[in-house]
């Protein structure tokens, strides 16, 4: 479960969270102890990940979600951690989409610049973007930061959507997540 952070909170170091729900972080992201990768503006955290706003006025609500534990490649992440991370991405993606009323939220997991496993969540607004078919990295508009009051509003809006999702989830009994059936490597078909 994701726990939101209010924009007016004092940030202090967290105590470990026993569950996998995104929650309100009570800290500034001190970064990975191994590589130093950190988020700009923390929004929410779970036992697996931390969500933060990437300050880019071209894509209001653009965020990064990073694994708390250091892994350099997605294929090295244990299944339980990866499942929790993907669940957090899904919750964050839905919250951002609803908060900023985006047509969609692109998810990109690259690892070319930062070796720490993380995902970019980029709200897209094709009806108002000059280049809706191009990736955010190729967007020709000048990258500028959001005004501080807009950042605080986004934190609050995303948190409100995370809270709504959490209430819905707690009122319905979720189906247990089962690991995928083991497949012998000889059964895998490569394209």
Question: Where does each model-flagged region fall?
Answer:
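HIT superfamily nucleotide-processing domains
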Residues: 2-191
């Amino acid at each position: 479960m994701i726990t939101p952070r209010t924009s007016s909170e004092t940030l202090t170091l967290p105590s470990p969270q026993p569950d996998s729900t995104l929650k309100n972080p009570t800290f500034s992201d001190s970064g990975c102890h191994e590589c130093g990768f950190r988020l700009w503006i923390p929004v929410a955290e779970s036992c697996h990940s931390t969500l933060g706003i990437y300050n880019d006025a071209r894509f209001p609500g653009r965020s990064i979600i990073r694994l708390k534990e250091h892994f350099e490649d997605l294929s090295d992440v244990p299944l339980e951690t990866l499942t929790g991370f993907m669940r957090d991405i899904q919750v964050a993606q839905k919250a951002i989409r609803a908060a900023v009323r985006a047509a969609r939220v692109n998810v990109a997991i690259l690892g070319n610049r930062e070796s720490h496993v993380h995902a970019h969540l980029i709200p897209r607004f094709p009806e108002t973007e000059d280049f809706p078919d191009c990736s955010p990295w190729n967007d020709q508009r000048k990258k500028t930061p959001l005004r501080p009051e807009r950042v605080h509003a986004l934190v609050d809006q995303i948190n409100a959507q995370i809270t709504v999702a959490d209430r819905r989830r707690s009122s319905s009994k979720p189906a247990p997540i089962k690991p995928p059936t083991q497949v012998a490597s000889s059964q895998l078909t490569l394209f």
